[in-house]
């Protein structure tokens, strides 16, 4: 069974999904960023971004980073 992400941050069609895993050295987070698009009636995802996606991409990544930092500060 695939593990579900613990947080999803979305701005427009840019989405970041954050996963949490426990390792020997402690808690680790990883982030996958995708751009959503429609191909006819079907929604798909891409890991490629155009020039106009970059401002939103920067904001989504910053929010993901902030969320991860806040998790590390919680007891």
Where are these regions (language model features)?
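Single-stranded nucleic acid-binding surfaces, predominantly the OB-fold ssDNA-binding core
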Residues: 1-75
């Amino acid at each position: 069974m695939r593990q579900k992400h613990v947080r999803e941050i979305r701005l427009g069609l840019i989405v970041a999904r954050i996963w949490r895993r426990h390792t020997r050295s402690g808690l680790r987070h990883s982030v996958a960023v995708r751009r959503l698009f429609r191909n006819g009636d079907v929604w798909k995802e891409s890991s490629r971004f155009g020039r106009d996606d970059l401002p939103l991409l920067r904001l989504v990544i910053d929010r993901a980073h902030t969320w991860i930092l806040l998790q590390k500060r919680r007891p």
